[in-house]
């Protein structure tokens, strides 16, 4: 087996329906990306102070570069997986795993940080005493609620997302326009747009400003949400770039505008300390008029959009896990479906616990969660930019429905977009800022990364697949294939001198989480009454059923036991099958019973012919 490539054959399954248009895609993307301003603005102001608008503008420029990279890559490879998928095509499965694992951390922290920001905005609507432990408790309750909702399988509505996006955009635009025409103190804001000026009010030094810019990057993460939905998008070549450009333009303008308005009514120090948990509600609450009515409205809007963002993070975890599991990058049991609700309950439970763990570890510190967020997100973004650059060089003739603009020609039909170069350098720089200046995010981030890589190596070796190669999936169509389901297994508890049939039945019932019934049939000759006394046979039958019960206990199964009298085993089994919903009958036999003229062989033939369910014979 080569370590460079490996082919795995899978069954062809129904593909996701392409139902999302540009408007729905924009709404879902905006709901994920647009929620970040509600906690990122305060974090940015904490470091960037009066230069917060500049930090947001620089982060916005990087976001635009990243968005254009995703527009090209998601249309070239319209599959789930985002940066993990891009890296798999450009590099190999190990690099793809690192990108996906970083993105998975990003999604988990999205759940944690979005849910944690909700109580701070809710208290603007319904005032309650401030307490970090109470906020953590409410956050844990919100995350658990989202877990239950996702396990039950409540569907996310694209139309609801679109409506919420419209309401949010109108509300944020109103804030910017109202301030612009009525009370915006632009000279005051401009006077504080200074960096590294000693003695100037609210002027950060260059180190603080770089940290502030890194925090501002948190406001723009989430563009992966659109790439993850590429497989469900109508006409992805047109729809994805359009939705990404709408998201890009709307967010950059509104975020910059809100930061300018904010610094007109609140000094940067208060915005980054006193109001760090709910900066947007604080801004409208400090308006010279209408603030006490506007603040609760924005508190409610923020809480709803943050709840949707947290839910999107949990959904993103399961989607990404499914995509990575298809390529054997994470254990496939992670997306095993719930027997009743048909949802990936195991992966949802694991990510719920991890999100709650991050909230508890943070001890109510948004900064810690933001650092961890940046650690994972910048790995994903950097890998996306590098994937574009590598594929532009290695495969210049690859079909690209959309190409990022502003290209530098490199000869032989090759070119590199300036936007991808800027994006790659910027995202790597932000990641290094987290690594060298944020010990909390760095330590937990590297722990996550190392544990993931070890798991990946172990899993790939266990599956005898290459670690650094490029796994390719070949799908084949088998029309007659249908997933087998077993809900109730019937096993004949015969006295044979072996337990093969009982063990087989128990193993199948355990695997399919099915009920199991064991029956022992006392055969009564036609010449005798059906209730004729056969004490010895009854004792043997009870002993056989006890053996069946003991074996079932070894498989942690609860077993139903039946002792019946009948003329033939075949007749008793057929009568039982007719009266109960059995999917499978398991019967143990001895070699000599298969002789052509034996009475048992004839019974076997009749059972096979007449049974309405599957019949399995175990010959010892």
Where are these regions (language model features)?
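Membrane-interface "cap" regions at the ends of multi-pass membrane proteins
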Residues: 1-51, 64-68, 76-80, 88-89, ...
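Helix-loop-helix junctions that connect adjacent transmembrane segments
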Residues: 11-12, 163-239, 243-296
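Extracellular loop-to-transmembrane helix junctions
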Residues: 17, 39-142, 247-251, 257
């Amino acid at each position: 087996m080569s370590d460079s490539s490996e082919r795995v054959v899978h069954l062809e399954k129904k593909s996701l329906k392409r139902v999302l248009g540009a408007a729905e895609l924009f709404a879902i993307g905006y709901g994920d990306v647009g929620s970040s301003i509600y906690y990122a603005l305060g974090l940015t102001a904490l470091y960037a102070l009066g230069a917060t608008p500049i930090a947001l503008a620089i982060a916005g420029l990087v976001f635009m570069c990243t968005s254009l990279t995703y527009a090209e890559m998601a249309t070239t490879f319209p599959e789930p997986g985002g940066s993990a998928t891009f890296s798999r095509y450009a590099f190999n499965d190990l690099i793809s795993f690192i990108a996906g694992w970083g993105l998975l951390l990003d999604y988990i922290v999205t759940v944690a940080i979005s849910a944690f920001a909700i109580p701070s905005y809710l208290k603007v609507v319904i005032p309650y005493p401030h307490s970090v432990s109470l906020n953590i408790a409410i956050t844990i309750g919100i995350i658990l609620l989202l877990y239950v909702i996702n396990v039950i399988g409540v569907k996310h509505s694209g139309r609801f997302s679109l409506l919420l996006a419209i309401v949010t955009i109108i509300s944020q635009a109103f804030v910017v326009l109202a301030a612009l025409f009525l009370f915006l103190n632009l000279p005051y804001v401009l006077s504080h747009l200074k960096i590294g000026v000693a003695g100037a009010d609210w002027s950060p030094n260059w180190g603080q400003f770089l940290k502030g810019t890194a925090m501002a990057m948190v406001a723009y993460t989430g563009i992966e949400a659109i790439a993850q939905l590429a497989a469900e998008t109508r006409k992805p070549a047109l729809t994805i770039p359009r939705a990404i450009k709408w998201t890009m333009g709307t967010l950059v303008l509104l975020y910059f505008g809100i930061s300018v308005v904010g610094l007109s009514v609140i000094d940067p120090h208060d915005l980054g300390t006193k109001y760090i948990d709910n900066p947007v509600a604080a801004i409208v609450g400090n308006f010279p008029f209408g603030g006490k009515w506007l603040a609760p409205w924005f508190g409610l809007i923020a809480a709803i959009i943050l709840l949707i963002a947290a839910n999107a993070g949990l959904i993103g975890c399961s989607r990404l896990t499914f995509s990575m599991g298809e390529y054997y990058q994470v254990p496939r049991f992670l997306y095993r479906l719930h027997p009743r609700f048909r949802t990936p309950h195991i992966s949802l439970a694991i990510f719920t616990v991890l999100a709650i763990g991050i909230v508890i570890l943070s001890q109510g510190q948004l900064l810690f969660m933001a650092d961890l967020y940046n650690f994972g997100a910048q790995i994903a973004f950097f890998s996306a930019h590098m994937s574009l650059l590598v594929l532009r060089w290695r495969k210049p003739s690859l079909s690209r429905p959309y190409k990022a603009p502003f290209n530098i020609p490199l000869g032989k039909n090759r070119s590199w977009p300036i936007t991808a170069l800027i994006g790659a350098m910027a995202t790597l720089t932000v990641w290094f800022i987290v690594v060298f200046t944020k010990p909390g995010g760095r330590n937990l981030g590297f722990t996550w990364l190392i544990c993931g890589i070890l798991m990946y190596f172990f899993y790939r070796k266990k599956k005898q697949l290459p670690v650094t190669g490029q796994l390719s999936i070949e799908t084949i169509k088998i029309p007659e294939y249908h997933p087998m389901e077993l809900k109730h297994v019937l096993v004949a508890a015969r006295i044979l001198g072996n337990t093969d049939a009982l063990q087989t039945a128990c193993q199948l019932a355990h695997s399919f989480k099915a009920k199991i019934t064991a029956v022992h049939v006392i055969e009564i000759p036609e010449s005798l009454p059906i209730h004729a006394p056969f004490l010895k046979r009854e004792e043997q039958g009870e002993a056989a059923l006890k053996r069946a019960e003991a074996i079932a206990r070894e498989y942690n199964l609860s077993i139903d036991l039946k002792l019946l009298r009948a003329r033939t085993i075949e007749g008793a089994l057929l009568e039982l099958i007719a009266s109960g919903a059995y999917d499978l009958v398991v019967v143990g036999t001895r070699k000599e019973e298969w002789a052509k003229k034996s009475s048992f062989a004839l019974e076997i033939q009749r059972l096979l012919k007449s049974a309405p369910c599957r019949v399995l014979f175990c010959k010892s």
